[in-house]
Structures are given as C-alpha cells and as structure tokens.
C-alpha cells in the first residue's frame, strides 16, 4: 500500500510538474488595439476568454488604442510589435519604408462614414459645402477624406475641417459646434443613435471608397523572429472571431471581463454593426486578404497620392501566416 501511495504521489507530482511546465511554456504576446475596447475587439477578447490563445501556448495581453494612425505609428517606430489597425493607415507607412506588414485582413471593407444630424439639412455629401466638419485626430478617416471628396466632386476648401480629440467628436456634433463628423458605423454613429440622435449617414464604402480596412499587422522583425508564434496568434484570433460571430452575447461578456469599463449595450451594437464587414465584397474566408480588394484599394488610394502609383499591393500584405483554407471559416 505504501508503494502505491508513493507512486501515486510521484505521479501527482509529475503531473503537477507538467502543468507547471506548460504554464511556464506560455509565450508572452502583447497585442495593441486600434481603439478603446468594445464590440470591434470582441474576437480577440473571445480568444482570451475561451482559452484559444492559451491552448496555442500564448499568454496574450490586449492593450487599448487611440486611433489607427497612432497604432500604426507605434509599430512603425518599434514601440509595438503586433497590432490591429486600419489597412490604409498601415499601408501609407509601409509605402514610406516602415518595416511592417499586414498578416490578416479582417474587415474586407471600411466602416468609415460621414455622420450629420438630420436637422442640419445635410442630405447628401454635396451639402457639406460651407459646413464645419469634425475630423478625429490620429484616426484613419482624416487621411481617407481626400479620396471621398474626389469621388464626390468636392474639395477640402469647400468646407471647414476641424481636427479634434476623439472624445470630443460626439458631443461636438450634438452641441452644434460642428455640422458633421468623419465617423464610423462601429463607433460614433452607434453612440449618437443610442443618445437618440436622428442622423444622415454617408458610408465611405457606398460613396466611392470601398477600401479594405482593419487588419492584424506586425513589424518585420517580429515576423522574422517569431513566425510560428504569429501563425498561432492569427489562428487563435480568427477562431475567436468565429466564436464572436456565432455567440455575440458571450463574446461581449469576454470583452467586459477584460475591460470592466466597457458599456455592454454599446459594445453589443458595435459588434452587430461590423459583422457584415468580415465577408463583404465577395470575400471567401474571414481574415484572408483578397487580391482583388487590395488591387482596388491600391488604385483608389494612388489616385489621391495616399499611396504611390504602380506599387505592388502585395508589398502591403501577405496570407503566408494564415491557417490552411480548410481550417478557416468560410464566408457564406
């Protein structure tokens, strides 16, 4: 009996040792978001909460952001290694020599929009002439504005553009300090509607600017030094997004657990708003770049000098680190 007990204790100790070793083997990864936590980050929160990262041997810390432009600069400057931001903001820096690359295209079209209160009488983009338009500092909408204006026969001089802090956008519109804002269907638009505002909304994608958007990207050093970690991170993240699309309420619970200050009602509405973006434009798989989408994006952005003409779109992105098609969620 004594031998059995000793063997049992030894086996228990061995198992505990394996568990400890597994815990110690977790690779730490810091993931920089483009924005404050909410519905647009639900897939990553689900990957944490459902244990997908942990099962892949990753100990992931998710850090909130303050605009895609700022997040892209963090990676370009080497202050962050792995992040999530608008593809246009990322591509602009890559075209200028920033050592980084998009490794998973998550939004197949952009959520940007112009938002105006109906009472202002703005019924079309042409009605922005002579108006004051709020532009969120450090975000992706500002750099893309020239493209929207050109596609609709407008110029920046037709209106007064006012750069302002992100937190000031919604109150400035509601208080009449600006007539319209450069917003997003997954952010300001929802916040305004939840406060009872009656809006006229003009999505960029429906007004001549159907560009690819929010994507996972990494520094070239991180990609080169950690290719297997990157593959595991992307696979677990896309699994998290698949879970979030199937279980939105539970995914928002995971967001709330990670970031207790999150407004559940708002985050739920945000997740519902972005859901169509994952498979828009005929995309075949969630998270996989479509060459045609990127070719169109390159052509549009080069028209207004946001990207250089003649650039190979594949210099901005790669699908090399994605799971095999059979392991990815297909778009229906």
Where are the predicted features?
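Secondary-structure end/capping motifs
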Residues: 225-306
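Short linear loop/turn motifs
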Residues: 61, 69, 163, 268-274, ...
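Short, glycine-/small- and polar/acidic-enriched structural segments
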Residues: 26-175, 179-186, 202, 210
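Pocket-lining segment of extracytoplasmic ligand-binding domains
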Residues: 88, 162, 168-261
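Bacterial N-terminal signal peptides that target proteins for export
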Residues: 1-12
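Sec/Tat signal peptide C-region and signal peptidase I cleavage site
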Residues: 20-25
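Conserved C-terminal helix/tail region of periplasmic/extracytoplasmic solute-binding proteins
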Residues: 295-332
């Amino acid at each position: 009996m004594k031998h059995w007990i000793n063997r049992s204790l030894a086996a228990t100790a061995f198992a505990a040792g394996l568990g400890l070793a597994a815990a110690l083997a977790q690779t730490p990864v810091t993931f920089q978001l483009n924005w404050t936590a909410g519905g647009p980050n639900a897939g990553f929160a689900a990957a944490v909460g459902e244990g997908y990262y942990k099962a892949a041997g990753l100990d992931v810390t998710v850090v909130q952001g303050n605009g895609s432009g700022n997040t892209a600069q963090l990676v370009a400057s080497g202050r962050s290694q792995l992040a999530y931001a608008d593809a246009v903001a990322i591509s602009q820096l890559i075209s200028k020599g920033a050592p980084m690359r998009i490794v998973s295209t998550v939004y197949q079209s952009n959520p940007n929009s112009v938002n105006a209160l109906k009472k202002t009488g703005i019924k079309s983009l042409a009605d922005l002439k002579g108006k004051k338009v709020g532009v969120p500092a450090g975000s992706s909408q500002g750099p893309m504005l020239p493209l929207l204006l050109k596609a609709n026969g407008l110029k920046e001089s037709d209106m007064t553009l006012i750069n302002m802090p992100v937190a000031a956008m919604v109150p400035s519109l509601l208080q009449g300090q600006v007539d319209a804002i450069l917003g997003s269907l997954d952010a300001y638009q929802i916040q305004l509607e939840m406060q009872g505002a009656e809006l006229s909304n003009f999505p960029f994608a429906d007004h001549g600017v159907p560009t690819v958007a929010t994507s996972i990207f990494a520094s070239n050093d991180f990609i080169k030094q950690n290719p297997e970690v990157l593959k595991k991170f992307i696979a677990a993240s896309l699994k998290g997004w698949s879970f979030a699309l199937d279980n939105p309420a539970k995914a928002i619970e995971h967001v709330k657990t990670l970031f207790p200050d999150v407004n559940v009602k708002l985050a739920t509405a945000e997740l519902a708003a972005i859901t169509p973006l994952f498979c828009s434009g005929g995309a075949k798989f969630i998270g996989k770049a479509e060459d045609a989408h990127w070719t169109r994006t390159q052509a549009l952005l080069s028209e207004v000098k946001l990207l250089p003409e003649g650039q190979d779109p594949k210099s901005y992105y790669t699908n090399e680190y994605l799971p095999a098609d059979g392991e990815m969620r297909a778009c229906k």
